[in-house]
């Protein structure tokens, strides 16, 4: 730390402030850990997702075969894919439970309204990550689920038809749908999610943790 302090003055103070920052005694229970557990699941998905991206091929001809290769041939591939899958399921559950806790304890009220809004966006982004990832194995179930999702988007007022075309890559389902979902899943949505997470944690640090009801 002294070596870093000489080259980056103030970093020791920042590290000490983070490590020794006090938290209210009422937060020392599992219900106040739901947000942190959600973040842990997101980190697991990022790490396992990088591993999966080394082998996955986002084309209609090769997508399913590459997933099968990861599962059956790549060393620890089945374990990594399972970790990615189940951390996603757990993350969605934890996001809902975290928001229920925040709502029940009134932690969304003034002056934390913007943090609540950021949390709502994070919920939508989490669902978007789950939905776009579902198509990537490109099997019958995931294909038709994505078609249904595009048709559901089509029912939105004003922007629905345009959104459907953007998702499908045309009037009908095309090969572009897979590549677009892949880019959304591994680049755009994670980047936006990280941005909202940073804002979320900054607001928590500035405003502090809310008092119990």
From Swiss-Prot:
**Which regions span the lipid bilayer?**
30-50, 88-108, 114-134, 184-204
Q: Which GO terms describe its molecular function?
A: electron transporter, transferring electrons within cytochrome b6/f complex of photosystem II activity; metal ion binding; oxidoreductase activity
Q: Which PROSITE patterns match?
A: CYTB_NTER
Keyword rRNA-binding listed? The answer is no
Output the CDD domains linked to this UniProt entry.
Cytochrome_b_N
Q: Which residues are involved in binding heme b 2? A: 84, 185
For biological process, the GO terms are: photosynthesis; respiratory electron transport chain
Enumerate the cofactors the protein uses.
heme b; heme c
The cofactor binding remark recorded in the entry reads: Binds 2 heme b groups non-covalently with two histidine residues as axial ligands.
Provide this UniProt record's keywords sorted from A to Z. Cell membrane, Electron transport, Heme, Iron, Membrane, Metal-binding, Photosynthesis, Transmembrane, Transmembrane helix, Transport
InterPro entries (UniProt xref): Cyt_b/b6_N, Cyt_B6_PetB, Cytb/b6-like_sf, Cytochrome_b_N_euk/bac, Di-haem_cyt_TM
Pfam family name, one:
Cytochrome_B
**Where does it localize?**
Cell membrane
Bilayer disposition of the protein = Multi-pass membrane protein
Is Transmembrane helix among this UniProt entry's keywords?
yes
The superkingdom listed in its UniProt entry is Bacteria
PANTHER family registered for this protein in UniProt: CYTOCHROME B
Q: In which family does this protein belong, per the annotation?
A: Belongs to the cytochrome b family. PetB subfamily.
What other note does the entry give for this protein?
Answer: Heme 1 (or BH or b566) is high-potential and absorbs at about 566 nm, and heme 2 (or BL or b562) is low-potential and absorbs at about 562 nm.
- Assembly and oligomerization: The subunits of the cytochrome bc complex are a Rieske Fe-S protein (PetC), cytochrome b6 (PetB), subunit IV (PetD), and a diheme cytochrome c (PetX).
* NCBIfam families documented for this protein: cytb_ExtP
What the protein does comes down to:
Component of the cytochrome bc complex which donates electrons to the photosynthetic reaction center.
**Protein's recorded name:** Cytochrome b6
Which gene does this sequence derive from? petB
């Amino acid at each position: 730390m002294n070596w870093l302090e000489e080259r980056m003055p103030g970093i020791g103070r920042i590290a000490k402030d983070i490590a020794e920052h006090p938290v209210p005694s009422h937060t020392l229970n599992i219900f106040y850990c739901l947000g942190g557990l959600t973040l842990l699941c997101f980190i697991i998905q990022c790490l396992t997702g990088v591993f999966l991206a080394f082998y996955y091929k986002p084309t209609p001809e090769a997508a399913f075969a590459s997933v099968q290769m990861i599962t059956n041939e790549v060393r620890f591939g089945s374990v990594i894919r399972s970790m990615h899958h189940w951390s996603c399921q757990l993350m969605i559950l934890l996001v809902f439970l975290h928001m229920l806790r925040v709502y029940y304890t009134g932690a969304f009220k003034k002056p934390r309204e913007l943090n609540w809004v950021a949390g709502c966006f994070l919920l939508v982004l989490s669902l978007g990550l789950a939905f776009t990832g579902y198509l990537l194995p490109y099997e019958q179930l995931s294909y038709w689920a994505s078609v249904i999702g595009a048709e559901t988007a089509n029912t939105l007022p004003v922007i629905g038809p345009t959104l459907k075309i953007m998702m499908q890559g045309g009037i009908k389902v095309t090969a572009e749908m897979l590549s677009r979902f892949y880019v959304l899943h591994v680049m755009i949505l994670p980047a936006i999610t990280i941005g909202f997470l940073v804002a979320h944690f900054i607001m928590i640090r500035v405003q502090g943790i809310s008092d119990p009801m």
